[in-house]
């Protein structure tokens, strides 16, 4: 417990930006960052769950890393591949649900790290097909912004699309490019449909009570 508290960042949950997004003006809670880079063993869901009673009364929120499964080995989750499969390097989906439920019984809310600016593919173009409830979800190449990876001279996504006969979105990136993964077109109806379902899944199925959005410089805040 002491090692974790020394290592993890303690953040007062009352910055001006948080107030602008709807935090009560009298909020006095404290948020704990429940991970650090490559803390796969130290902050596994099962370990955090055992420490939940120690947090009770001191922390109101715990910020967890992006918990969806990626397409590879150990990962912090910031190369997202699946929206609805949350068997990650930190534990299984069931272990995550159990952790969040234990937090709740100890008066602690879990904050999800939401990575929706970019998405990992299998190769250049292949996105996984997922089913949740009675609906099927899958990103398409037309959900990739027209100028994806434009900063990478000689191997832009657009040039590769021409070589492969692939159609991208006609819309350009609304913010900073994230190299090496496909930046998503947030004007796309398909992207919007998937993201909305994903956020509902995080709250209604997994039990998160709020979000921290990653790479917010990459897309328009109006979305």
Regions found by a protein language model. Give the residues of each.
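Hydrophobic h-region of N-terminal signal peptides that target proteins for export
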Residues: 10-19
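Substrate-binding/active-site clefts of carbohydrate-active enzymes
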Residues: 22-46, 50-51, 57-206, 222
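Short catalytic-loop micro-motif centered on adjacent basic/acidic residues
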Residues: 210-216
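Sec-dependent signal peptide recognition
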Residues: 2-10
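Active-site environment of divalent metal-dependent phosphoester hydrolases
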Residues: 219
């Amino acid at each position: 417990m002491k090692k974790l508290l020394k290592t993890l960042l303690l953040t007062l949950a009352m910055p001006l930006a948080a107030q602008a997004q709807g935090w009560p003006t009298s909020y006095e809670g404290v948020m704990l960052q429940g991970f650090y880079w490559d803390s796969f063993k130290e902050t596994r869901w099962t370990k955090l769950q055992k420490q939940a009673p120690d947090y009770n009364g001191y922390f109101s929120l715990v910020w967890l890393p992006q918990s969806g499964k990626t397409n590879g080995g150990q990962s912090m989750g910031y190369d997202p591949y699946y929206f609805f499969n949350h068997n990650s390097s930190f534990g299984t989906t069931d272990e995550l649900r159990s952790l969040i439920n234990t937090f709740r019984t100890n008066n602690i809310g879990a904050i999800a790290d939401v990575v929706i600016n970019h998405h990992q593919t299998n190769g250049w173009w292949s996105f996984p097909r997922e089913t949740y409830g009675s609906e099927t979800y899958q990103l398409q190449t037309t959900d990739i912004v027209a100028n994806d990876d434009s900063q990478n001279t000689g191997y832009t996504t657009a040039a590769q699309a021409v070589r492969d006969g692939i159609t991208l979105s006609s819309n350009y990136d609304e913010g900073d490019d994230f190299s090496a993964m496909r930046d998503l077109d947030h004007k796309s109806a398909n992207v919007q449909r998937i993201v909305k379902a994903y956020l509902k899944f995080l709250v209604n199925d997994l039990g998160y009570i709020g979000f921290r959005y990653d790479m917010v410089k990459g897309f328009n805040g109006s979305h």
